[in-house]
């Protein structure tokens, strides 16, 4: 009787241990599932954090690029403002120079015109500016007691011999040839400056040089 009870008690203990093992295995399985789920969630969180970090780094890179671009633009605008200011100053200085040059040119032109008027009155000579620079055309008036004598002239500006002959003829009539030559030269200069061709014709350039040579050479 005692032996039967002992076996029954043993079986109960074995059964209890078995059931406990079953519960432990069940709990272990649940725990493993929870650990796996936790690891899966943790992995998802890590991946999400990595993606977020990549986005943050990308945004930081964009922000840095935008900041550098903005700094470059600010620097460029500063340089541009300096260049604009420098250009304004240069333009003002240029306007002042042009104004001074125009004023000096007007003064010089007034002096020349006054000189031409004086020489024209002194020599009694009128030079047709429309004919210049190709031709030296005009008239010299010799004042007389009874009547005035008109001496018209119309020569090719390159006709050095004709100009010399005219100078000799005027000199024989007691005309101040030196002043006459100065008058023609001044009128020639004023006319050519007024027309101011960008590329002076070859004939005009030659005619001016010949007249200058003729006017500076002594007359007999």
Swiss-Prot record:
Signal peptide: none annotated. Its main location: nucleus. Keywords: Cell cycle, Cell division, Centromere, Chromosome, Coiled coil, Kinetochore, Meiosis, Mitosis, Nucleus. Residues 41-119 form a coiled coil. It is found in: Nucleus; Chromosome, Centromere, Kinetochore. One of its GO terms (cellular component) is nucleus. Transmembrane segments: none annotated. GO terms for biological process: cell division; meiotic metaphase chromosome alignment; meiotic spindle organization; mitotic metaphase chromosome alignment. It comes from the Eukaryota. The keyword Manganese does not apply. Acts as a component of the essential kinetochore-associated Ndc80 complex, which is required for chromosome segregation and spindle checkpoint activity during meiosis and mitosis. Required for kinetochore integrity and the organization of stable microtubule binding sites in the outer plate of the kinetochore. Participates in SAC signaling that responds specifically to disruptions in spindle microtubule dynamics. The NDC80 complex synergistically enhances the affinity of the SKA1 complex for microtubules and may allow the NDC80 complex to track depolymerizing microtubules. Component of the Ndc80 complex, which is composed of Ndc80, Nuf2 and Spc25. Belongs to the SPC25 family. This is Kinetochore protein Spc25. The gene is Spc25.
């Amino acid at each position: 009787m005692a032996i039967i009870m002992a076996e029954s008690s043993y079986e109960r203990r074995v059964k209890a241990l078995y059931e406990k093992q079953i519960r432990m295995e069940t709990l272990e399985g649940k725990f493993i599932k929870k650990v796996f789920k936790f690891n899966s969630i943790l992995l998802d969180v890590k991946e999400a954090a990595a993606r977020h970090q990549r986005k943050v780094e990308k945004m930081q890179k964009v922000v840095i690029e935008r900041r550098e671009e903005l700094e470059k633009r600010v620097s460029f605008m500063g340089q541009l403002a300096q260049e604009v200011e420098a250009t304004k100053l240069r333009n003002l200085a240029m306007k002042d120079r042009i104004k001074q040059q125009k004023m000096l040119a007007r003064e010089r032109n007034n002096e020349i015109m006054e000189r031409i008027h004086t020489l024209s009155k002194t020599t009694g000579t009128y030079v047709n500016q429309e004919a210049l620079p190709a031709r030296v055309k005009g008239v010299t008036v010799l004042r007389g007691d009874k009547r005035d004598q008109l001496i018209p002239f119309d020569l090719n500006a390159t006709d050095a011999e004709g100009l010399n002959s005219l100078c000799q003829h005027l000199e024989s009539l007691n005309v101040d040839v030196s002043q006459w030559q100065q008058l023609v030269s001044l009128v020639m200069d004023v006319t050519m400056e007024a027309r101011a061709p960008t590329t002076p014709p070859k004939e005009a350039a030659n005619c001016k040089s010949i007249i200058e040579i003729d006017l500076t050479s002594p007359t007999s």
